[in-house]
């Protein structure tokens, strides 16, 4: 297993340990981490800026079915389903880059603005950044009307680098 270091803040991603806060279980190889992932400590550097400091790349160990089994511990309550301290397992299909290829970026689908469903606001529990579905976020590439659930799961908060999982439904207080 390899270790990769952020050149700015010296954060180290260790494949053998993973990064559960970011959604990467132990033994998650560097190659399956999304290309647009950013450093969880400083949010200044992207994956491509990290430096291999120990071990070798595990690209040859990716299975041909492009599937990764993930087990994650949920440590805070989910607003909608009230999940708390539960272990969840999931099987995630991955686009795996082979030598000489790049992962294909995908744009989220945009919900029809005329659908009649109310747009919601989501707040980052780490820094307070608010994502408003009605406004979208053109800097991040999300058109007005882009639903939060349509944003890629590997998206990071543009202000602090927190994961999408660190956002909760924002409810404005009236009066």
From Swiss-Prot:
Involved in the hydrocarbon hydroxylating system, which transfers electrons from NADH to rubredoxin reductase and then through rubredoxin to alkane 1 monooxygenase. Residues 1-53, 119-170 form the Rubredoxin-like domain. One of its GO terms (biological process) is alkane catabolic process. Pathway: Hydrocarbon metabolism; alkane degradation. SUPFAM superfamilies: Rubredoxin-like. It comes from Pseudomonas putida. Pfam families: Rubredoxin. The lineage of its organism: Bacteria, Pseudomonadati, Pseudomonadota, Gammaproteobacteria, Pseudomonadales. Fe cation 2 binds at residues 124, 127, 157, 160. This is Rubredoxin-1. Its cofactor is Fe(3+).
């Amino acid at each position: 297993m390899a270790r990769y270091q952020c050149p700015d803040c010296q954060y180290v991603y260790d494949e053998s340990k993973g990064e559960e806060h970011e959604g990467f279980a132990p033994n998650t190889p560097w190659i399956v981490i999304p290309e647009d992932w950013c450093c969880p400590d400083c949010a200044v550097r992207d994956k491509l800026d990290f430096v291999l400091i120990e071990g070798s790349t595990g690209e040859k160990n990716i299975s041909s079915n492009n599937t990764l089994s993930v087990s994650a511990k949920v440590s805070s309550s989910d607003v909608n389903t009230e999940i708390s301290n539960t272990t969840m397992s999931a099987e995630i299909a991955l686009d795996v880059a082979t030598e000489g290829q790049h992962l294909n970026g995908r744009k989220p689908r945009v919900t029809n603005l005329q659908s009649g469903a109310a747009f919601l606001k989501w707040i980052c529990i780490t820094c307070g950044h608010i994502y408003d579905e009605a406004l979208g976020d053109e800097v991040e590439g999300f058109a007005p009307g882009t639903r939060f659930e349509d944003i890629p799961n590997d998206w990071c908060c543009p202000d602090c680098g927190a994961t999408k999982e660190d956002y909760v439904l924002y409810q404005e207080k009236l009066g």
